[in-house]
Design a protein with these regions (language model features):
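Charge-rich, low-complexity N-terminal segments
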Residues: 1-51
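A signal for specific C-terminal beta-sheet/loop modules enriched in small/flexible residues
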Residues: 2, 6-7, 28-38, 75-95, ...
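C-terminal charged interaction modules
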Residues: 104-156
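Negatively charged, Asp/Glu-rich surface segments that serve as flexible interaction/assembly modules
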Residues: 59-127
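Short, surface-exposed beta-edge/turn micro-motifs
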Residues: 51-52, 62
Length: 156
């Protein structure tokens, strides 16, 4: 089994779960999917090999990860409660960051970007922790997946 077998080859965000977003947020969503598919490590527990497809949706206020692969099909549901604080803070700082890009000084933009990255790291580490028994992810994969989870939470 090659290490590259444990990877995502497709990612779908459930249309019914998606919130209306700004152009900046939509662009970030598309970049995250592109980057995720270009390079990732995604190894579901109990699966011998990939590659895998992933559909991300919200079901009754929980995050649903539908994973399919050769001889593998499973849905993992995660409570969003542990993510609420970091999602709220991340959304607020992103909104400030997008506003700052248009109007603020480079120093203000840099400060907001540092805060945004810090919260993004916190959210992706929490995602890795919550999925630890279900799916093994590398740091970059967790970061890109966290971006997509945020996309489901943003309310334009």
């Amino acid at each position: 089994m090659a290490v590259s077998d444990h990877r995502l080859q497709s990612v779908i965000l459930d249309d019914e779960s998606l919130a209306a977003v700004s152009r900046d947020q939509e662009q970030e969503r598309q970049i995250a999917i592109f980057d995720l598919l270009e390079e990732n490590h995604f190894a579901p527990a109990g699966s011998e090999r990939g590659p895998y497809g992933l559909k991300i949706s919200l079901i009754d206020g929980r995050l649903a990860l539908d994973i399919t692969g050769p001889s593998y099909e499973r849905r993992h549901l995660l409570s969003l409660s542990p993510f609420r604080g970091v999602l709220k803070d991340y959304r607020m700082i992103c909104e400030s960051y997008y506003d700052a890009i248009r109007n603020a000084t480079p120093q203000k933009i840099e400060a907001l970007d540092m805060g945004r990255r810090g919260l993004h790291n916190e959210g992706s580490a929490l995602l890795q922790q919550r999925l630890a028994e279900k799916v093994e992810l590398d740091v970059d994969t967790a970061r890109r997946l966290f971006t997509l989870i945020c996309a489901l939470q943003w309310r334009g």
